[in-house]
Amino acid sequence: MSNYSKIKDIILKLNSEELLKEKLYIVGGTVPYLISNTMSNREHSDIDIIVAANDMNAVREYLKDNNLYVKDFDSIMFDYNKAKIDYGIDCIIDGITVNFAPYEIVDNTMIQKNFLIKKSSGVNALVTVTIENVKIEDCTTTVIVGQTKIKTYNLEMVRVMKEKSHKQKDAVDIEVIDKYGYDEKKYNDLKIKTNNMKFK
């Protein structure tokens, strides 16, 4: 059974909050459905969001103000994060995990940080992904859902990322993108750039 309506409501609420407006980019499997304005028939386990590194303080402030902040979900507080570098934060809203991951653009390179927790992923890890020659405007778009303005990865970037996975849910999401349509030139350009994506 799909939980998409609940997921969509959470995304709309977060993007309506004064402290978070214009700061969030939705990047996960919900994007094809938000952009195409179609109902997802699959279960969505979480909401993936990237945030400019210098806006992460606003995210933490919002979570604390709304009793959503949990120290154990904040990467800065992890005992294995010795350098106390920000790799993002999770929170739980209406039973759904929402992940806020910081990104920055340095010398025309997109650097995204995130983390894995042993409880859910089987391993504790701090992850850095770099994509060269990509600006935020190359891989994002804006969509109006109802009355709410939402920033997301564009469909081309979502398709590229989904292709790197071989999960059934990603194949389903790619079908939605293909049915709606996307810019092949932009897609091919992003595909080339992400081929050199580095993980550490």
Report the location of each language-model feature.
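Compositionally biased terminal segments of proteins
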Residues: 1-200
